[in-house]
A protein has these predicted regions:
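Short cysteine-rich loop/turn motifs with clustered Cys
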Residues: 13-44, 65-67
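Short helix-coil boundary/hinge micro-motifs
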Residues: 16-25, 116, 120-133
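Polybasic, low-complexity binding patches
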Residues: 1-9, 36-38, 42, 49-63, ...
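Bulky hydrophobic/aromatic packing residues
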Residues: 14, 30, 84-86, 133
Length: 133
């Protein structure tokens, strides 16, 4: 059975994708650092930053405990760059989003090496990166 949401349809391999995102986060919430521990009230979930469940790009998926998921749902989104100063964990994901928007390399290693330049580009500040790639 295909899982649906208001924003679209989850891919058929969603459970595998979500399991991988949680594993890459070390079984911990990337926002608050709590380990997955349902007995203590910390169940790890996967959040789509652009609210589109069909978009499973690495920069769009974050492992969050349910508490953080509910806190950021609809508040921390790609189109709100002012969040960057208050939310350091968010920077790499926004940089990946901008790399995709500007048709630049989107692999995690490349994006992480160019985070600040990508954010500058996304916020309308020219960068040598645009010319160099």
């Amino acid at each position: 059975m295909t899982r649906r949401s208001e924003g679209g349809t989850y891919p058929p391999n969603w459970h595998e994708v979500a399991r991988q995102v949680k594993a890459e986060a070390g079984g911990c919430c990337i926002r608050c650092g709590h380990a997955h521990s349902p007995a203590d009230g910390y169940t790890l979930t996967v959040h789509h930053l652009d609210m589109n469940p069909a978009n499973c790009a690495w920069w769009n998926l974050v492992a969050l405990c349910q508490r953080c998921h509910l806190t950021i749902q609809g508040r921390v989104v790609m189109e709100r760059p002012w969040m960057l100063d208050h939310t350091p964990w968010f920077k790499a994901y926004v940089a990946g989003h901008y790399a995709a928007l500007f048709a630049l390399p989107g692999d995690r290693e490349w994006v992480l090496a160019h985070v600040d330049e990508l954010i500058d580009m996304g916020q309308g500040r020219r960068s040598a990166l645009a010319v160099a790639v």
